[in-house]
Design a protein with these regions (language model features):
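N-terminal "arm"/small-domain region of PLP-dependent enzymes with the aminotransferase-like
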Residues: 2-142, 391
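Short coil/turn segments at secondary-structure boundaries
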Residues: 51-55, 214-215, 331
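Walker B catalytic acidic pair
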Residues: 294-295
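Structural motif of enzymes handling amino- and sulfur-group chemistry
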Residues: 354-420
Length: 420
């Protein structure tokens, strides 16, 4: 094929598809090398966190024991875990398996929730047993109770540098950051928070789909890109933004800001000056600016502070566990939204005809649809509303997510983080 013609065709496809095409085009002898190098673009780590996985698999043995305690047929059929007395069974299991890989993390996590959050032992262990065997639909559908507690604490530590704002974050557990992105774009549009032709700002470099999705015919947002093109006196790239570009956020025509922080690529955090400037703009010039921040790489940056820590009222945060724990295959992420937030306020202030449309949309879920939080609307929208009763991330995925969070919370010497 003509080289120039090939280049022209390649310009129109996504970088991820381009990577696959380049691998296919490589000579057989070069394919392994090409795949190793090019797959880095997907952000797929070449390590795993072992302790949370050891705890997960050990908990699986306990879960099966509890099921067989209720019923154990030779055909390979067992019962489902019962709540009453299950904590005492778990404590006995830990004592019997105290030297098994994962036992220490399970015991520490159990004690953490009992001591720090006054968890009822039977309720906690019953949630864990059902989660590890995956015998039920997720209830609550947004995120399991004890998973949410662990992940809330984890986000306060990692996204807020242990200085979270007042109030609590509501969390929605999703099938990785990619699902979170889809749910956010869909629900922003379904709830009239972003409409075709609305102005949004993308801070680039960014994860490529954030650039591609707004161009789809369904959305057709008016996109302004601001580029991290600041240089130092020696002409070196700082991967930071000019004040002039940041000031474009002052326009009320800009409805939303999408930011990947740290950037992806090249993994630079926003400078404190830029962060402070955006916070000032939101407070003084454009108070209705919605901020959607993807902070998956924040755990690799010392003392990281997300927009969810600095201006929680305006911020919707996506965090994925995939990169830090070597877990892209687990599809573990959360959407975090403060209990008091701009998104709920904007929905409440919609024109009457739009509020009536939304009332009809969510009327099968509650007698007062107008009071339904935006984050709960996202859960319903993720399953076309009608399937809301079966919404939610699978129980085993949530169990592993909770153990990932607990592992980081209980690593008081930050040995894992320092190795990263």
């Amino acid at each position: 094929m003509d080289t120039k013609l090939l280049e022209k065709k390649m310009e129109s496809i996504s970088p991820f598809e381009l990577k696959n095409r380049l691998i296919d085009m490589a000579d057989e002898s070069l394919k392994k090398t090409a795949r190793t190098m090019l797959n880095a673009g997907r952000g797929n780590p070449n390590w795993i966190a072992t302790a949370p996985r050891e705890a997960f698999f050990l908990l699986g043995s306990f879960g099966l024991e509890e099921c067989r305690r209720i019923m154990d047929l030779p055909e390979g059929i067992a019962g489902i875990p019962e709540k009453k007395g299950i904590a005492s069974h778990f404590e006995a299991f830990l004592k019997k398996n105290n030297n098994a890989p994962g036992a220490k993390l399970l015991e520490q996590t159990y004690n953490y929730l009992l001591m720090q959050h006054a968890a009822d032992p039977d309720s906690l262990v019953h949630e864990w047993a059902e989660s590890i065997v995956g015998d039920q639909y997720p209830v609550p559908d947004r995120i399991l109770h004890f998973t949410e507690i662990l992940v809330q604490d984890y986000l306060s530590q990692e996204m807020c540098d242990n200085r979270p704002p007042r109030g609590a974050y509501d969390l929605f557990a999703t099938e990785g950051g990619t699902a979170a992105m889809c749910y956010i774009f869909d629900s922003l549009q379904e709830n009239f928070l972003l409409n075709k032709g609305d102005g949004i700002v993308l801070m680039v470099p960014a994860f490529t789909p954030y650039i591609e999705i707004p161009q789809l015919s369904r959305y057709q947002f008016r996109v302004t890109k601001i580029h991290a093109n600041r240089m130092n006196n020696e002409g070196m790239h700082l991967w930071q933004y000019s004040d002039e570009d940041i000031d474009r956020l002052k326009s009320p025509k800009i409805k939303a800001l999408f930011v990947t922080n740290p950037s992806n690529p090249p993994s630079y955090t926003l400078s404190p000056d830029t962060m402070a400037r955006i916070v000032s703009i939101v407070r003084n010039d454009n108070p209705n600016l919605m901020i959607i921040t993807d902070d998956v790489y924040g755990t690799f940056s010392p003392h990281f502070r997300s927009f969810m820590a600095e201006i929680p009222y305006n911020t919707l945060c996506v965090y994925s566990f995939s990169k830090y724990f070597g877990a892209t295959g687990w599809r573990n992420a959360v959407i975090a939204l403060h209990e008091f937030n701009l998104f709920d306020k904007l929905i409440a202030k919609l024109p009457k005809e739009k509020r009536e449309i939304l009332h009809r949309r969510y009327s099968t879920l509650t007698l007062e649809p107008e009071k339904l939080k935006f984050i709960d609307r996202m859960v319903a929208d993720s399953r076309q509303v009608a399937l809301n009763h079966t919404a939610g991330l699978s129980l085993p995925q949530q169990m592993q997510m909770g153990l990932f969070a607990a592992f980081a919370l209980l690593d008081k010497e930050n040995k894992y983080k320092q190795k990263m």
